[in-house]
Amino acid sequence: MFENLSDRLGTIYKKLKGRGVLKDADVDEALREIRIAMIEADVSLSAIKPFLKDVREKGVGQKVLKSLTPGHQVVKIINDELVSLLGGEFKELGLAPSLPTVILMAGLQGAGKTTTAGKLAKRFKDKGKNCLLVPADVYRPAAIKQLNLIGRDLEVEVYQAEGETNPVKICQNAVEAASGKMIHVVILDTAGRLQVDEELMAELKTIKEKVQPHQSLFVVDAMMGQHAAEVARTFNEAIGIDGVILTKMDGDARGGAALSINSVTGGKPVCFIGTGEKLDALEPFHAERIVSRLLGKGDVMSLIEKAETAYDLEEQAKLEKKI
């Protein structure tokens, strides 16, 4: 993932770090190139504009441009703003004070929601937590069958509706049943649609009102690019989401969805990324590691360390003069 954007940013960074003196025009040129690179990566314009504005405000000025290592300082600023754009520090899904913790999975049909529900269950099981998977997509018998197969493979209990066909009641009954057992986490696999519609949102709203999940996670295909962020915004405005899981990241060479979602949804973080079809192919979304990978790993991190060291030396010199 991010291959194309990584190549473009690497070239821009080499230009910046190779100049001993930077002018406002040099920073503006770099920002124009970054803008083009992000557009080509299918990043949403509503995410690009504030990002570039923040970088320019911090990267242009006497303090940075007259520092010992202006190019390195600007690289560090871009790095920090990219981390912020991606949502900052990863926060693990917490458990509720009392059992069970209820997680609602929402998203469009075909995003990989059912498989992702299984991946989450495996993640919790590996940490010693008992899970209950709830097949609430009554419109697709294949989804119910798939979740039962996943539960069998993981040796995780799957709730059996026993003839109930109302998805709201299925979720309510499942949570009630889990409350009488030592179930730590209940994962609700709700219905999807091929596109956003009022009926889907109304059903999800009712489930949320009746069940009161502790986490509502939106699952979306990363291959959709910036459109994934727009759909996430629609779901957030309609039902309120707490975070996003991006699937099929192993096939997304551009990374537009990952770079757009936090900004477009008003701060809803990408929590996890799916990197394959196997049930262990779910990774926490660490923004700093993603940016490190995006910007050339060790090379950029060494630049940032140099910039921080240079800044510390300058501050020390100023302090010594005052003394």
Tell what function each PLM region has.
Residues 8-136, 143-163, 170-190:
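Primarily NTPase-proximal linker/entry elements flanking Walker-type ATP/GTP-binding cores
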